[in-house]
């Protein structure tokens, strides 16, 4: 595996972890809830994280 492939896999792993984190928050607090700091609903965060994972998978 070359350096670029390794970096892509590392970033993919990080993006998957972020997706897992928002899924956990949705299960705890609900899909329409949001963080007080920025008021972004969990539904939007989920869509963003899914998009990030899809982008990384396409790079693999």
Set out the residue ranges of the language-model regions.
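Flexible "arm" and connector segments at domain edges
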Residues: 1-60
């Amino acid at each position: 595996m070359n350096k670029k492939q390794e970096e892509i896999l590392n970033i993919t792993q990080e993006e998957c972890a972020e997706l897992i984190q928002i899924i956990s928050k949705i299960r705890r607090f609900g899909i329409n809830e949001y963080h007080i700091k920025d008021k972004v609903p969990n539904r939007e965060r989920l869509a963003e994280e899914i998009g990030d994972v899809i982008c990384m998978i396409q790079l693999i």
